[in-house]
Amino acid sequence: LVSGRLTNVAGSSDVLRGSIVSYSSEVKFDVLGVSPGPVVNEQVAVEMAVGARRVLGADVGLALTGVAGPADQDGVKPGTLCVGLALPDGSTTSRTFHLPGVRDQMRQLSVISALDYLRRAIAEK
């Protein structure tokens, strides 16, 4: 969803190297190098962002992991979104959001929340 939103803009190939949809836990572990365990927390979001940056050879890694419902996942409530960033200077940052709404609303709010978080982090650097 995030890369889809970014590629709606002409010229996006100048700034977007690619994206990885790690919907399954196995892809998080095997492709992105996430430590085994529950996958919806800020540490996992950071590990995903670092892994995406490494795999794609990108300056910045942005990662989202969360629960859109309808049921809890490993005790994490629907609407929970963890965003991780891996920045060019090697620093990382993360944040947890609690999003309202039903599944489709949460998915769209996830994109908005993650891109705004990225924008703010880059502006602060």
Question: PLM features: what roles do these ranges have?
Answer:
Residues 1-125:
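Short alpha-helical segments enriched in small residues
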